[in-house]
């Protein structure tokens, strides 16, 4: 039942492929539905070693989204495609049915859409045809009129000039097309590296993650999505999705281009689903992590970004670090912000890790000292 509800949420999320459709009402509805499919009534967790934990995350109340380039698995977020074979498939596709020109028009349309919602494919095509088919004077008049009407920036004007040059090649020969997509492998890497990922999990008591990420000497932070009220934050966090485990499907750039050219809501949703499937699928060996991830994208950023969100609700610390200065700072910050603090400790009598409030642990230590 829960899986079906999640799949319905994912399907609904993908149906809003155009960001312009994400009105405040739509975002609020999506976020409300997300809260119903998240585990633990909207709470997710992040494990961190004390040695590498940045205390300012708690002081400034931000969540770190890491570039996919920094992920601990090079396969993670990589597209399951052979770039050399993809180039050949794309060349063949572009040489058929004037698809190269159609793609140029669509690419420029997508660049202008956010700033010029009234722009149409036909308006761009008419401009390109007029400039390339008529003399220099008429072509320049059309170019200037188009730039003025849609208030193009200097950068957008230059992109239009480059598009005109490619569009005007009557032969549409293989050499021109091959040259224009020759850096596909580099582009694939840039797309991956510009993805910003926040990886979370379903619980605080995963011994394997305490060992792998914290070396049994770290913290686990609890994030409560119910504390998100801001529209812009909701818009970011509606992209929180469940990671799938198994073999990635083969990825085809031609299929994405076809969907973009079709330009229907259904086709765009399918394209988004194909791309996100690559970003959300990991090998079965990672299954125990039960990961949920929030995905964003910042072109050119291969480091990561801070997302300011005051959504911490509890912090779990391993008993071994309680005397560390950084741990004391964390506890003090938790008290100031009314976050719950729990301690993870190993029970020799039960041969199990247990969790209790820091108040109870402190009382127990105090009582033991009195006995001794």
Feature roles, as predicted:
Residues 1-372:
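Partner-binding and oligomerization surfaces adjacent to conserved cores of proteins
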């Amino acid at each position: 039942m829960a899986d079906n509800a999640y799949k319905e949420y994912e399907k609904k999320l993908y149906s809003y492929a155009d960001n312009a459709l994400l009105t405040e009402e739509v975002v609020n509805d999506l976020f409300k539905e997300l809260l119903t499919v998240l585990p633990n009534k909207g709470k997710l967790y992040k494990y961190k070693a004390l040695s590498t934990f940045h205390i300012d995350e708690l002081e400034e109340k931000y969540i770190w989204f890491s570039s996919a380039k920094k992920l601990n698995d090079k396969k993670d977020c990589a597209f399951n495609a052979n770039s050399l074979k993809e180039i050949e498939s794309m060349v063949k596709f572009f040489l058929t049915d004037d698809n190269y020109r159609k793609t140029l028009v669509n690419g420029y349309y997508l660049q202008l859409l956010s700033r010029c919602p009234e722009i149409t494919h036909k308006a761009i095509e008419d401009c390109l045809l007029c400039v390339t088919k008529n003399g220099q004077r008429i072509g320049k008049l059309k170019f200037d009129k188009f730039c003025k009407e849609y208030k193009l920036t200097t950068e957008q004007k230059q992109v239009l000039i480059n598009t005109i040059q490619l569009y005007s090649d009557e032969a549409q020969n293989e050499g021109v097309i091959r040259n224009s997509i020759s850096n596909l492998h580099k582009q694939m890497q840039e797309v991956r590296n510009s993805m910003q990922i926040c990886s979370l999990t379903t619980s605080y008591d995963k011994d394997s993650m305490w060992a792998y990420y914290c070396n049994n000497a770290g913290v686990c932070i609890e994030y409560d999505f119910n504390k998100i009220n801001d529209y812009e934050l909701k818009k970011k966090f509606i992209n929180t999705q469940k990671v799938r485990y198994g073999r990635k499907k083969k990825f085809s750039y031609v299929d994405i281009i076809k969907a973009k050219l079709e330009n229907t809501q259904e086709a765009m949703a399918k394209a988004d689903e194909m791309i996100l499937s690559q970003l959300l699928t990991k090998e079965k060996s990672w299954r125990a992590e039960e990961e949920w991830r929030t995905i964003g994208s910042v072109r050119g950023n291969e480091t990561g970004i801070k997302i300011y969100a005051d959504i911490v609700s509890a912090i779990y610390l391993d008993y071994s670090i309680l005397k560390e200065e950084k741990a004391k700072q964390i506890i003090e910050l938790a008290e100031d912000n009314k976050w719950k603090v729990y301690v993870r400790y190993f029970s020799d009598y039960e041969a199990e890790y247990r969790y209790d409030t820091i108040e109870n642990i402190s009382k127990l230590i105090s009582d033991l000292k009195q006995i001794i």
